[in-house]
Swiss-Prot record:
MF term (GO), any: DNA binding
Region (Disordered) residue spans: 1-21
Subcellular location, record wording: Cytoplasm, Nucleoid
Cited NCBIfam families: DNA_YbaB_EbfC (TIGR00103)
One Pfam match: YbaB_DNA_bd
Protein name, entry field: Nucleoid-associated protein MS1507
SUPFAM superfamilies reported for this sequence: YbaB-like
Summary of the function given for this chain in its UniProt record: Binds to DNA and alters its conformation. May be involved in regulation of gene expression, nucleoid organization and DNA protection.
Keywords assigned by UniProt, alphabetized: Cytoplasm, DNA-binding
Length: 109
């Protein structure tokens, strides 16, 4: 099934990939992305681990409807989370490049 040294090479590749993925996950957790809603009136900045770092609200919204403001904050957070997920996929793709991973396989991170 495995050629000469094939299993050993496969295990070595898997270990190297795991180490690269761990390092990349640590880097991603430190990155910050900002999501926006209401044409930039509300901005939410989160890190790669989806922890909220900052919320910015344009002063003009403080006089408006509370429900609308809450919706805008939620939308901005969701936008930031989507951007963080996309960034994570891009970064991890560079780690798994060349590995025989089936299409659509969801990585455990």
């Amino acid at each position: 099934m495995f050629g000469k040294g094939g299993l050993g090479n496969l295990m070595k590749q898997a270990q190297q990939m795991q180490e690269r993925m761990q390092k990349m996950q640590e880097e991603i957790a430190q990155l910050e992305v900002t999501g926006e809603s209401g044409a930039g009136l509300v901005k939410v900045t989160i890190n790669g681990a989806h922890n909220c770092r900052r919320v910015e609200i344009d002063p003009s919204l403080m006089e408006d409807d509370k429900d609308m403001l809450e919706d805008l904050i939620a939308a901005a957070f969701n936008d930031a989370a989507r951007r963080a997920d996309e960034l994570q996929k891009e970064k991890m793709a560079s780690v798994t490049a060349g590995m025989p991973i089936p299409p659509g396989f969801k990585m455990p991170f």
